[in-house]
Amino acid sequence: VLLVACLVTCAVGSLLYFAHADINKRTDGKGVQVDIPHEVMHHLADSYDWHFTTFGETHVTLHLPIIVKSCVDGEWHVFTSHDVPDGFYFDENHHGKVYERAADGTPVKPWDFSITKLVAQLIIVVVLLLSIFLSCARWYKKRDETSPAPRGFVGTIEMLVMYIHDDVIRPCVGEHQYKKYANYLLTMFFFIFTTNLVGLIPGAANVTGNINVTLFLAFCTMLAINVFANKIYWKEILWPDVPWWLKFPIPLMPAIEIFGIISKPFALMIRLFANMMAGHAVMLSFTCVIFFGTTLGLGAGMGLNLFSVIMLLFMYALEVLVAFVQAYVF
């Protein structure tokens, strides 16, 4: 019941968020004209402000700090998109990134260390995870081995941690090596899972739908695997147990295994990015479809709106499952 209530709330919130954000500027008397590809890409993209919704002519927006080091005067500048100083502007030809003009008018890209919408949500996720696990740690410190098993929220977290630790990491990595990787893999799982779930909240950013984030996660995983690997792992990479003619004189299998060091993290990166971006794009598309109901008759419009809401609920339920599966696979 709680899950259904959450899904309905998120679906209705998405409709209200999208409606207030775009309906006011696209009504021409005949209905609402929505450019679905433009709206989808706009909501998936990163930005220097966090736009939540619009009521009439009032925009509810959080202007995030833009921190750049100028390549023209060499100075640091801190401002927001609401108050851009002279010499800086947002270049729409470069996805709205901040640029500055040199003395001769040439566009120059400064060193950009801004807290964008994606960065802000990453900070929120990190604070949320620290709050969850530190509170659970305090609960355990107050008890000993004779205390009853935890219930409620702490019990749910323990169940999830033990499932990933005992049923996933331990059998997959091996009895002798799993302790070395357990902390990293648990951290990676809960970070991706929480980030995916937070991204489903209406108005939130799609962090794991950004290729830069998944690239960094895949790079960290590649380092963790290869830096802490033992000699058995490298023996299977450089001299695998295959017929000798596959290794000498042409090292076919070693070359394939070495290529796999890069291709496997690359596959993880693309899989997480593509699944999360596609899921959000489909949900946004179904949200946009509801506005076409105003251009149809009453009966057809109500039918289209009902179809859109049902499909949006289905996609939300599917995305909750995908959020867990993608964290599990990664």
Task: Identify what each model region corresponds to.
Residues 1-151:
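Perimembrane topogenic segments of multi-pass inner/organellar membrane proteins
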Residues 182, 187-201, 212, 216, ...:
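Hydrophobic alpha-helical transmembrane segments and adjacent short intramembrane/lumenal linkers
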